[in-house]
Amino acid sequence: MSIVPVKMPKWGLSMDEGKVVHWYKAPGERLTEGEDLLDIETTKITNTVEAPASGPLRRIVAGVDETLPVGALLAVVADEAASDAAIDAFIADFQTNFTPETEAAESEGAMQLRMVEVGERVLRIGTTGGEGAPVVLLHGFGADLNNWLFNIDALAAAAPVVAIDLPGHGASSKDVGDGDLAGLAAAVGEALDALGVREAHLIGHSLGGAVAARLALDRPGLARSLTLIAPAGLPGSQVSAEFLTGFSEAERARDLKPVLEQLVADPALISRDMIEDVLKFKRLDGAQEALAALSARMLGGGDFAALRSRLAELPPALVILSRGDAVVSPPDEAALPASWRVAWIDGAGHMPHLEKAAEVNALILKTIGA
């Protein structure tokens, strides 16, 4: 085998560096391609880097607690045929010629951000280039389009991607009206109209799953496929009032931290920077009011009841669930349409698309026919 570098990945638009927090393997140990190799902490979340190839881990270049730019050399994988001198030369050459990635050096397929007027609102939308029906990504309660940072690149390799900050979230207008599901879906639909999108693969997480389903109902023929990840609003499913209330009301890091930890199976995934980013968002004008309106509407349950009564009108869907979800309880599978498929993800909480991104990406790619 050739000498294979392990490099600092780029997860999402805003990532320009990462910190090594844990190595699962030591130099000399044999790797299997795809197994967990190390954990990297970003400003959003901590995630695992998988081994890029099978073979001995010949050298670890980046130590624990070391912060390095995207693309930097972390380790080297190579079989015994490669001499130590060859490994040393490879590392020296890499370090000598390495230039940190910049926006100017990013590929033409990189996501571009824009603000799109939707009635009296403005929505922030990220898009990648390409031909064909796009993948439309709709995040959950309290999140933004960066919630898909571990999914965008994998999906963009197969189809154009449109990621949207829902009303009340991210950089979009904070006006959500009374927070009704129909209003959120209508705003997304108008944004897609502005982009000229007539057909799309709709993918929604949590509240975004309910929005995606409602959008598919309100615009027959729009959804080429429908993927719902830990979705709210399905039969037998309940959204945690404790989470919604805690998220909406928390004003300090020490209060928000245990709330965010409910999102994931491993609380260590919630970074200090992620907590601070959420607090910064909540301090924006209108953000608290938007969250309160959306939370009250979800807890009222009327929109979800209306959605459940029309599931049979929806196209076949993939529902991705985690048994460790502490925010949205699993639906009654027997009450779902017979054409729907359910996939369970082990070792994840409410955020399987972040916690187990490779598995979720593979499921989505299969669903969209990639």
Predicted features and spans:
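Conserved serine/cysteine hydrolase catalytic core
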Residues: A287-A335, W344
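A short loop-to-beta-strand scaffold at the N-terminal edge of the catalytic core in hydrolase folds
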Residues: G119-T128
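Flexible "cap/lid" loop of the alpha/beta hydrolase fold
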Residues: A213-L217, A223-R254
